[in-house]
UniProtKB/Swiss-Prot annotation:
Membrane topology (UniProt): Single-pass membrane protein
Protein name, as recorded: Photosystem I reaction center subunit VIII
Residue spans crossing the bilayer: 7-27
Species in which this protein is naturally found: Lotus japonicus
Subcellular location: Plastid, Chloroplast thylakoid membrane
GO cellular component labels: chloroplast thylakoid membrane; photosystem I
Coiled coil: none
Alphabetically ordered keywords of this record: Chloroplast, Membrane, Photosynthesis, Photosystem I, Plastid, Thylakoid, Transmembrane, Transmembrane helix
Family of this protein: Belongs to the PsaI family.
GO biological process: photosynthesis
Known role: May help in the organization of the PsaL subunit.
PANTHER family associated with the record: PHOTOSYSTEM I REACTION CENTER SUBUNIT VIII, PTHR35775
Length: 34
């Protein structure tokens, strides 16, 4: 259980920005700003 934060923290650090970028991309695609 001691190694859980060392794995979980970088995972959240990568997944959270990726989800933010994906949601922004879908938002722009839906509104046809491109």
């Amino acid at each position: 259980m001691t190694n859980l934060p060392s794995i979980f923290v970088p995972l959240v650090g990568l997944v959270f920005p990726a989800m933010a970028m994906a949601s922004l991309f879908l938002y722009l695609q839906k509104n046809k700003i491109f």
